[in-house]
């Protein structure tokens, strides 16, 4: 394959927003309880996001108009978003998105699928945790305004027949090109894992590795959480 195009500047979704504050007469204002999370969103036929699924398994309708990148219809997107839960007007509860962007979430590929080889430029893990069908990662990378390309390398998949256990070893593909290290930026990644949790696996562990700025390999191991 050609060099994967999952850049540091991931797509920002178009939002038509109401104000964050609502006047309740005089000087009284209501400030909604804003949450920030990784979410799985689905767009409808018109390219607008219809629903979001939280990592605790709760499905909500999206109450405001949010357009998927390129107005892509009938697709599933992994996003990181600021949102608030609100009554939907018919006795239920939905969410209003105040800011959202897609995450870097390609399916991991074996090393031989990268025609130009594996790029292992360093990055720092700010946070990493297991979500619903995804491993969520917030990276800090040193940048100077140029493009950084990310992907995930499937290094090894081991199967224990006796225990019906699958162990998956993944690593970060990071190509910083010639970008100078002037300042630090964040990158939001979320590795899809459902393809490894097939019916024959009673359990699944995921090992994720990357090179840090000290030139050392860091590894993190998680147990997959069944939906």
Give, region by region, the residue ranges found by the protein language model.
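Bacterial N-terminal signal peptides that target proteins for export
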Residues: 2-11
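C-terminal motif of bacterial Sec signal peptides marking the signal peptidase cleavage site
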Residues: 18-23
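First exposed extracellular module after export/assembly in secreted or surface-exposed proteins
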Residues: 2, 33-227
């Amino acid at each position: 394959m050609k060099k994967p195009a999952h850049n540091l500047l991931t797509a920002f979704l178009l939002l038509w927003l109401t104000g964050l504050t609502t006047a309740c007469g005089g000087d009284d204002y209501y400030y909604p309880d804003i949450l920030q999370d990784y979410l799985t969103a689905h767009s409808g036929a018109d390219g607008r996001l219809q629903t979001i699924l939280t990592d605790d398994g709760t499905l909500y309708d999206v109450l405001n108009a949010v357009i998927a990148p390129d107005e892509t219809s009938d697709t599933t997107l992994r996003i990181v978003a600021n949102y608030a839960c609100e009554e939907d007007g018919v006795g239920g509860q939905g969410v209003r998105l105040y800011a959202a962007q897609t995450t870097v979430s390609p399916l991991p590929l074996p090393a031989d699928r990268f025609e130009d080889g594996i790029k292992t430029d360093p990055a720092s893990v700010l946070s990493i945790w297991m979500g619903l069908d995804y491993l969520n990662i917030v990276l800090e990378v040193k940048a100077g305004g140029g493009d950084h390309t990310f992907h995930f390398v499937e290094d090894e998949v081991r199967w224990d027949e006796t225990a019906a256990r699958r162990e998956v070893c993944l690593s970060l593909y990071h190509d910083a090109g010639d970008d100078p290290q002037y300042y630090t930026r964040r990158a939001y990644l979320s590795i899809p894992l459902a393809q490894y949790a097939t019916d024959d696996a009673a359990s699944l562990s995921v090992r994720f590795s990357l090179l840090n700025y000290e030139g050392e390999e860091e590894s993190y191991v998680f147990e997959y959480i069944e939906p």
